[in-house]
């Protein structure tokens, strides 16, 4: 009753073994609260999906608020409640729940809140326990055949907009005024642009970089002195290059060895093998291989050297 105000349109849903006198008393109390400008409609919860109520008709929808509540609201019923509510309308749902999920027909209060959110409702309140008389509690236990039942009340609101509604966006394509940058102080800029010319006064002594070099530093070194000292052991010892020689001694010693001639590049008998299969002989061992550069060494496997027959 706290969510009902004068002038509201209220839908009261009932279900289970509720007496007609109790329904009439509840409707009378609601009608008194909404006043002459408001109205109250009554519908059985099982026939809600078959009713012909228009969308966004009611300010408040109350379901299961008549004790003892035995209705377990399905997802379709909650979605229909959300459809019937006006934007920012309120739904009040009372339902029997259990403390732990046992896989039966009753669910926990947390799952009831989740179902309201899945139906499209927002601002779901915390579950509040509804006090029942001993007689109402016995009737509820007899109807559901479940122990440890706890009736809770949860309220939720419909968003302040309709599903599929649109709103015009105010976009401005006018050019924005350029903000003038503050002018820099000339004295501040000079501080960060000091040079040697600015400091050329009597208080500062500047050194000439050429005066830091001696005559020995300016002499051109002898190329012989630049060679590495590796392999120098006098006339009695044989010169030997290092393992990873980088000074050129290894190449020099290799060229000084007598009887060693430079390896000649490999050549073919006909001189056309490197051009490709179109220029090769019928018995050329390079058949089937791609063209290669003249003089390039090509290694053939044992299978290629043997004939097919």
UniProtKB/Swiss-Prot annotation:
Monomer. Residues 4-169 are annotated as: N-terminal SAM-like domain. Its cofactor is [2Fe-2S] cluster; [4Fe-4S] cluster. Belongs to the anamorsin family. This is Anamorsin homolog. [4Fe-4S] cluster binds at residues 270, 273, 281, 284. It holds the Pfam family CIAPIN1. Residues 230-247 are annotated as: Fe-S binding site A. A motif (Cx2C motif 2) lies at residues 281-284. One of its GO terms (biological process) is iron-sulfur cluster assembly. Its main location: cytoplasm. Keywords: 2Fe-2S, 4Fe-4S, Cytoplasm, Iron, Iron-sulfur, Metal-binding, Mitochondrion. Component of the cytosolic iron-sulfur (Fe-S) protein assembly (CIA) machinery. Required for the maturation of extramitochondrial Fe-S proteins. Part of an electron transfer chain functioning in an early step of cytosolic Fe-S biogenesis, facilitating the de novo assembly of a [4Fe-4S] cluster on the cytosolic Fe-S scaffold complex. Electrons are transferred from NADPH via a FAD- and FMN-containing diflavin oxidoreductase. It is found in: Cytoplasm; Mitochondrion intermembrane space. [2Fe-2S] cluster binds at residues 230, 242, 245, 247. One of its GO terms (cellular component) is cytoplasm. It comes from Branchiostoma floridae. GO terms for molecular function: 2 iron, 2 sulfur cluster binding; 4 iron, 4 sulfur cluster binding; electron transfer activity; metal ion binding. Residues 170-218 are annotated as: Linker. Signal peptide: none annotated.
